[in-house]
Curated annotation (Swiss-Prot):
<feature type="modified residue" description="Phosphohistidine; by HPr">
    <location>
        <position position="78"/>
    </location>
</feature>
<dbReference type="InterPro" id="IPR036542">
    <property type="entry name" value="PTS_IIA_lac/cel_sf"/>
</dbReference>
<dbReference type="GO" id="GO:0046872">
    <property type="term" value="F:metal ion binding"/>
</dbReference>
<protein>
    <recommendedName>
        <fullName>PTS system lactose-specific EIIA component</fullName>
    </recommendedName>
</protein>
<dbReference type="InterPro" id="IPR003188">
    <property type="entry name" value="PTS_IIA_lac/cel"/>
</dbReference>
<keyword id="KW-0598">Phosphotransferase system</keyword>
<dbReference type="GO" id="GO:0009401">
    <property type="term" value="P:phosphoenolpyruvate-dependent sugar phosphotransferase system"/>
</dbReference>
<keyword id="KW-0813">Transport</keyword>
<keyword id="KW-0479">Metal-binding</keyword>
<comment type="function">
    <text>The phosphoenolpyruvate-dependent sugar phosphotransferase system (sugar PTS), a major carbohydrate active transport system, catalyzes the phosphorylation of incoming sugar substrates concomitantly with their translocation across the cell membrane. The enzyme II LacEF PTS system is involved in lactose transport.</text>
</comment>
<feature type="domain" description="PTS EIIA type-3">
    <location>
        <begin position="4"/>
        <end position="102"/>
    </location>
</feature>
<feature type="binding site">
    <location>
        <position position="81"/>
    </location>
    <ligand>
        <name>Mg(2+)</name>
    </ligand>
</feature>
<dbReference type="GO" id="GO:0016740">
    <property type="term" value="F:transferase activity"/>
</dbReference>
<keyword id="KW-0460">Magnesium</keyword>
<dbReference type="Pfam" id="PF02255">
    <property type="entry name" value="PTS_IIA"/>
</dbReference>
<comment type="subunit">
    <text>Homotrimer.</text>
</comment>
<feature type="active site" description="Tele-phosphohistidine intermediate">
    <location>
        <position position="78"/>
    </location>
</feature>
Length: 104
């Protein structure tokens, strides 16, 4: 995989992870407003985006496992960072929504 392909893959991961992050933060706002069903829907939609980002990441891992040399790019590293922090946010969001439910 050349640098341009790695950069494009990085942008793809950033886009999916960014969409997921936005949905998760919107879910937090919904939970804060007492709209728990909406919050759960947004978390599920975010999870779909994370799955898409993970598929892109998995394609990268598969290419490397097949012996393809991967030229790293800052964009690809940025995408990986975005994805991992978004996954962490999703894990925390479930707990935060539950705390809002208990407090109402």
């Amino acid at each position: 995989m050349n640098r341009e392909e790695a950069t494009l893959l990085g942008f793809e991961i950033v886009a999916y992870a960014g969409d997921a992050r936005s949905k998760l933060l919107e879910a937090l706002n919904a939970a804060q407003a007492g709209e728990y069903d909406r919050a759960e829907e947004l978390v599920a939609a975010a999870d779909d985006c994370i799955v898409d980002a993970h598929k892109a990441q998995t394609s990268l891992l598969a290419k490397e496992a097949q012996g393809d040399d991967i030229e790293l790019s800052v964009t690809l590293m940025h995408g990986q960072d975005h994805l991992m922090t978004t996954i962490l946010l999703k894990d925390l969001m479930k707990h935060l929504i539950e705390l809002y439910k208990r407090g109402s």
